[in-house]
Structure formats: structure tokens, C-alpha cells
């Protein structure tokens, strides 16, 4: 399951989504995640889902990679959906047995939550799959630039956020390797009581922490060897400029979000 986590990876390409200004992509990604939770009708959430899959098609990245990124959260989606099914008692009763009651509102709410979580992950994957670490850092730094007035270290914050995001797949891959190595040595990680399983994780966590600190040290040394000293005086080989394509994308996003608000008024509400 660990190797199925793909969020944080970058897949180079030349699609229209890859060529968008990273500031536009970051802004629309944040807004889209917000509007996924704003959508509270079947029509609104369907509109958001169709828009997300349309963008996925435009990225020219295999769809299976996006669905691969959903595998690790299937358990979370399932548990959340079941909780909503069994704990929501409003609406028409569809099935009742002792203390278990399933209603139509519970089913609709659980479906809405499941779709929301899945679409949110897909939106995040679109951003990381189509935006290089350098572009993502520049986008975050530019968007946070007004905070420099109150002496917030914008560049350093943007750099830390990007490094943390990009280290996710690296650490997950390292975890998978360590787990496989421990299993090859006879470690049993899947049986026993809860405390036994927790203790069995210690031989995995200690090497993982050592590896993480080693990679952090190597990265720090590499940045120091390249004379990196923060954002002050830093120049950029690639300057960000908004094009007509970016403004058109921004307008499309605004129309989509307005459509979601309007669709919320269409019954039935979830």
C-alpha cells in the first residue's frame, strides 16, 4: 500500500496544464478543494467531479496513476462512509434491525463524503503531478510575498513546504524497502496483539528516522555547496509571467465555482 502513494511526485510533460503558471495552478487548487466542501447537492458535486476528470484528461498523465494515489485512502473513505451511514438517522428509513438504522439521507451523506475525499486527493495530485518543485516553491513564495512587509520569512517557508511535500514519496519508498528487509529477516508485522504490532514497528521506525536525518543532512550539504543562503539576493533563471492562457484558466475556474454555488440551490440537497 505504501508504494501506491503517489502524491508529491512530479511527472514532466508538455500538456496545457503543465504549461500553466504555477501561481494559477496553486490558487485554483486551493479554491477547488474549498469548493469541493462547499458543494452540498448532487448536481454541484457532480459538476466538480466532471471538471476534475476533464483536467486529468488534459494533463496527459495515465489515469491509473491518479487512481493509484487513491488506494492508500480507501480504508479512510470506507470507515468515514460507514460512520455516516449508521449514525445519521434523519430521512426515510430504508432498513432497520435492532439498534442499526439505515436511512436515505445517511446513504446520500456517506456517498457525498466519499466523493469529496476522493476528489480532494485527485485535485492535490493534479497540482503535484504537473508542477516541478522549483515552480511550486516560486508560486508559494510569490503568493506569500505580501507577508514580507511584516518580516515573515516567505522564501524559507515556501522552501520548507516544498521540500516536505517532495520528501513524502521518498520516505514512503524508504519505508517500503525497510519493511521488506525486515520481513526477509523473519519479522512478523501483521499478527499478534496491538501492543505486539506496535513493538514490531520499532525496527522499522528507527532505521527510517536515521535515513530521514541522513537525507536531510545530505540535502543541506548539497544546498550549502551551491552557495544557497536563503531568499535574499536570490535570482531566478525562469521568470513567471501570466499569459492569456492563464487568465482564461482563471476565468474558467471562476465560472465553475459560480456554477457550484448555483447548483447548490437545485434540490434535492444532500
Language-model regions, residue ranges each:
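Transmembrane helix-loop junctions in multipass membrane proteins, especially transporters and channels
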Residues: 41, 45, 60-64, 88-96, ...
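Membrane-helix interfacial "entry" motifs
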Residues: 14, 37, 60-65, 97, ...
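Alpha-helical transmembrane segments and their helix-start/interface "positive-inside/aromatic belt" motifs
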Residues: 25, 64-74, 246-249
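Alpha-helical transmembrane segments and their membrane-interface exit regions
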Residues: 51-61, 75-79
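Juxtamembrane/interface alpha-helical elements of multi-pass membrane proteins
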Residues: 73-187
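Transmembrane alpha-helix interface motif
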Residues: 1-42, 48-57, 142-145, 149-152, ...
